[in-house]
Amino acid sequence: MTKGTIQNQESFLNRIASSLGRERRTGGVAVPEWAHQPQYKTLEGYSADDLVTVLKNHCVKIHTELIETDSTGLYDALREQVSRFSGGPVIIPKDPRFEEYGLKSLLTKDWPSEGTPVWEWDADKGEENIKKAEQANVGITFSEITLAESGTVVLFSSKDIGRSVSLLPTTYIAIVPKSSIVPRMTQASDIIRQNIANGVTVPSCINYITGPSNSADIEMDLVVGVHGPVKAAYILVSDR
């Protein structure tokens, strides 16, 4: 991923300091240690299986089907879920995990031979990727981090993993490795912060997706699918 550049940072910060009527503080600034941090108490001590139960229960509330399987059953589980969503066209990011999880033959041979088009995101194709996403019935991605408390999958966008894959198709499927499940956004933020400390380039676009698209008015009338997929499903892979 290309590292971005920051422009006019110094003049911007100097202007803020000037507006506050003081000089810039360039040293001795530290993150405070708060006496109370309740965000870490929620779901504290929950085992991996406990977090799966929390995730399953919340998926019911967000109108998202959760299918449990393992690496051996993932091929059939994904095939069946796409069928329940009325088939393709299918769009996927360029992600080596599809092959690692035993899905290459499904995506490159089996579905295409049955008349189900599969488009793999190609950075060199530019706008054509977005058109394919608009035409797709199902978008499939992996969840990088999964929040049990809210039933949220976290996606890291890149040149090979376009945001359109999970946004524009009519339906969406997230493949959720069990190892990706954490209690809540607190832990997800810690993971991202640690990546930064380790020198890992953080994506410019990080998406927190909680089931299908939802929108509500002041009278709390819920409408699904206004600005994203109408239906969503998570396939939990228990041995990953």
UniProtKB/Swiss-Prot annotation:
<dbReference type="GO" id="GO:0006089">
    <property type="term" value="P:lactate metabolic process"/>
</dbReference>
<comment type="similarity">
    <text>Belongs to the LutC/YkgG family.</text>
</comment>
<comment type="function">
    <text>Is essential for L-lactate degradation and allows cells to grow with lactate as the sole carbon source. May also allow cells to utilize an alternative carbon source during biofilm formation, since it contributes to the formation of architecturally complex communities when lactate is present.</text>
</comment>
<protein>
    <recommendedName>
        <fullName>Lactate utilization protein C</fullName>
    </recommendedName>
</protein>
<dbReference type="InterPro" id="IPR024185">
    <property type="entry name" value="FTHF_cligase-like_sf"/>
</dbReference>
<dbReference type="InterPro" id="IPR037171">
    <property type="entry name" value="NagB/RpiA_transferase-like"/>
</dbReference>
<dbReference type="InterPro" id="IPR022823">
    <property type="entry name" value="LutC"/>
</dbReference>
<dbReference type="InterPro" id="IPR003741">
    <property type="entry name" value="LUD_dom"/>
</dbReference>
<dbReference type="Pfam" id="PF02589">
    <property type="entry name" value="LUD_dom"/>
</dbReference>
